[in-house]
């Protein structure tokens, strides 16, 4: 019996060793490329490491997630022109729609693939001013005072810049007696106070924070908090305007790329992970507003209440883009190049 037991034990050990060997042999080295908009570097650096660890524990596969950042419109054009992103996490739905329509590398129904129209987090637009708010900036109307310089990126290349512009437009239209013409005049006045248009939100932040240009930065809320906390601690204040915009930066799988590379399963798991409580808490930590309603109270301790309009209130992205940002549209009409 002892000999038989020893034999069974040897067979069992061999079986376990073989299973481990097969598991190791089957494990793969995978890479994903996340092409994102400008100020998401810190958010995805933290999320990527945690997701890669979870994926390896689940599958045995070693996963490396690479990031590419820039103005949302520029990033969309890069993917259109052949950059092999497995996923895109951009500032505007219209940028993803552009890829779906032009190169067709993303399926047209991308918005239906993940919750909340494929938007895992939201943000808004606030003002970042220098400590003590020396120019007394409280609302959009203060941005056109004679001695105020405003820093904002170029809406031709930056998704954040389009949110900035639309928030300003919505405020102007909402004023007593506000009309299309008065809103257009306000935008013309506002952009006459902009000394430089950077190509992306992070570039504008560095212009304001490091180059010390301007009195107020129109910024993603997360970028304003980051600047206040890390880029210039004690040097800036955040001002919440009376009306802003609900910024909804969406995500999508780049279907033609993942099917070519065989990464659809891991790409889908990666974007689904963004909706988990773990990733949603990382979003809060990085100053994004979560979409998970169970975290609303937790998020409310950090984020001030704010009245917002949505892109739907402004007619949707197709209409807004055609009206404001297409060649010859309102932005081209009101912006006088320096």
Please name every model-derived segment:
Residues 132-138, 157, 170-178, 257-265:
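Short helix-loop capping/hinge motifs at secondary-structure junctions, enriched
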Residues 28-157, 300, 335-336:
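N-terminal segment of the mature folded domain
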Residues 124-133, 248-265, 282-286:
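A bilobed periplasmic-binding-protein/Venus flytrap-type ligand-binding module shared by bacterial periplasmic
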Residues 22-27:
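Sec/Tat signal peptide C-region and signal peptidase I cleavage site
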Residues 35-37, 129-131, 149-176, 190-194, ...:
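Short beta-strand->loop
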